[in-house]
Amino acid sequence: MIAPEKLLETARTLEPRLVEWRRTLHRHPEVGFDLPETKALVKKALTEMGYTPQDCGKCGVLALAGGKKPGKTILLRGDMDALPIQEESGEEFASEVPGRMHGCGHDMHTAMMLGAAKLLKEHEDEIEGTIKLEFQPAEEIFQGSLDMLKNGLLEAPKVDAAVMFHVLAGMPLPAGMVLVPGGDRKSVV
């Protein structure tokens, strides 16, 4: 089992890289299944960390951490696609692509997934079971997960449980708070 203190210590060192990934993705938003730059960034980062990323479906990416000790397989999912709307934020890292922007946080989700991948790789020998990382396209058009499911997302290794996350911008919550609703949740996206 990975000690929380070790994870936090490593996580604190990743902040500059997370900001860099997020801002790069934010400047170059891509929509639907048409994510060549985003997918290339994800696969390059994963490869540099020591993963062997695998394509899944039209544009999804998978990577495995752990697997050296017995245990369950947990899927960790993050989405990568942007929205077909014009950004008017004026931020220094605003979209450079007319009519497209990361207005729903998927740039952050992708950066956070890469951060999780880095943490997991650095503590891989401590993982009981396997963590399957899913970088999903086309969430905004409700097609990305369906495509990945049809192309073996939940197999090899078989997934026992899945977790996804989403930022809640504008919510009156303190920084660092995580909300986890009770009970089972299921989704098609």
Regions found by a protein language model. Give the residues of each.
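Histidine/acidic-residue-rich, glycine-tolerant segments that coordinate divalent metal ions
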Residues: L62, L83-P84, G90-M101, M108, ...
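Acidic/His- and Gly-rich active-site-bordering loop/insert found
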Residues: I2-H102, A111-I127
